[in-house]
Amino acid sequence: MINKLYIATDSTESFRFNIVDSTDLVQSVRDIHNTSATASAALGRLSTMAAIMSHELKNESHNITLNLQGNGQGGMLISTVNGRGEVKSYVSHPEVDLPTKSNKKLDVGSFVGNEGLLTVIKDFKLKEPYIGQTSLVSGEIAEDFSNYFYQSDQRPTVVALGVLVDTDLSIKSAGGLFIQALPGFDESLIDKLESDINKFPPISSLFVTHDDPFDILNQYFSDFDLKLLGQKEVQYLCDCNRDRVERSLISLGKETLTELIEEDGKAELVCDFCNKKYNFSKEELMELRDNI
């Protein structure tokens, strides 16, 4: 299923508003990785953030990778999006679940951890990718990205991410909101924006009752006279293929491939992002080795 990212600005072009209903995308995360409730919330939030950031990609071959490496029980979380709006994600320990917090919310902060690094890699196919890194603030992900954007862009930024997991572990709703001041923004509008944000309910709950994300923006930020700049389709789709896996095997070198042939006589590689299995016979491994 395909979701849509909506990109808007206000009448004074002081702020960019991005909003996405990522329910179907996060359901794919759940289905592929068989995540626990807490893991679904954590990886779902990160995947939603990747979808939101896809608006920066003007070329289909460009991509952004988000990496959370905290001290929590979930281990490493990764989400990558390309210029086509295709998101793929991974978590080290999808099976880990944690007790809910006292407010009955899923404990994403403990799953990720509040000590560690958030890394953003933007590959625009230049000589070197851009790599930005900040320390984790809470592990709740939205706060960590708000801090990242404040540190990297030096502009006021609001990030809201939410995943509502049903009792059967399916994804009831998921979505994200991103608001950032644009260069030369009207500072007199900050107080009004903060007032509207304080009235904003939990983002995931809104997509239970609203079908159109842009309607949500217009409802809660009506004073800003928003205009829609564009829409972008986003979905969970892994771009792995056999050729790429073959190149990975070749990169091991002749010696390692020879050991693999002699000891196992075959190989099975599993994609971390979609769990697709690639099997290679002894003859296929020998052919790869002989072509090095």
UniProtKB/Swiss-Prot annotation:
Entries under Gene3D superfamilies matching the protein: Hsp33 domain, HSP33 redox switch-like
Disulphide bridges: 238-240, 271-274
Matches recorded under InterPro entries: Heat_shock_Hsp33, Heat_shock_Hsp33_C, Heat_shock_Hsp33_N
Keyword Disulfide bond: yes
GO biological process: protein refolding
First and last residue of the signal peptide: none
UniProt GO cellular component terms: cytoplasm
Compartment annotation: Cytoplasm
CDD domains associated with the record: Hsp33
Record-given protein name: 33 kDa chaperonin
